[in-house]
């Protein structure tokens, strides 16, 4: 292991970033779902997050905005819990980061919130530490996210209207 250095760090790198930009520019899909191993929006330090790579994170956000690409959402995992974070912007639509990562490895014993208690981007009641999975339903006018426990019982329901994901 080496010390994490935030100067010029990248999760995607040049080749994958070029591919992502091209795919976004050439997509005619209503929804463009980008799946990352780490959260894009959670700004709390001390865990794997795109905030550990600020230049690359900003490059992605700026590219989406500068090119007015509608319908972009991010899916992530690797937190041993599930949650939804939404980052609101003045000049473009809210960016959603749906995290689901607790079906096979839930957070063992949650030892308190620490800095994450004050996470202003988290959607109320979306933080789930028990075994769960998310069912995504794609409709022409909205995306529906249903987080369910391992027995299939609904734990949390969230919808994102398509009209909320555009310019």
Question: Regions from the language model: what does each represent?
Answer:
Residues 1-167:
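Metal-dependent phosphoester/phosphodiester hydrolase catalytic core
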């Amino acid at each position: 292991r080496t010390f994490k250095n935030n100067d010029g760090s990248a999760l995607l790198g040049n080749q994958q970033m070029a591919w992502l930009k091209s795919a976004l520019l050439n997509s005619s899909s209503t929804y463009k779902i980008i799946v990352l191993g780490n959260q894009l929006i959670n700004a709390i330090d001390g865990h794997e997050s795109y905030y550990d790579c600020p230049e690359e994170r900003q490059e992605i956000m700026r590219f989406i905005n500068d090119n007015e690409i509608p319908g972009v959402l991010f899916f992530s995992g690797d937190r041993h819990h599930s949650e939804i974070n939404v980052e609101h912007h003045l000049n473009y639509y809210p960016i959603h980061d749906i995290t689901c990562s607790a079906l096979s490895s839930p957070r063992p014993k949650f030892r308190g919130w620490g800095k994450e208690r004050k996470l202003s981007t988290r959607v109320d009641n979306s933080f789930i530490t028990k075994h769960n999975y998310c069912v995504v339903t794609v409709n022409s006018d909205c995306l529906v996210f249903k987080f369910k426990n391992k027995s299939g019982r609904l734990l949390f329901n969230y919808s994102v209207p398509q009209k909320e994901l555009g310019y």
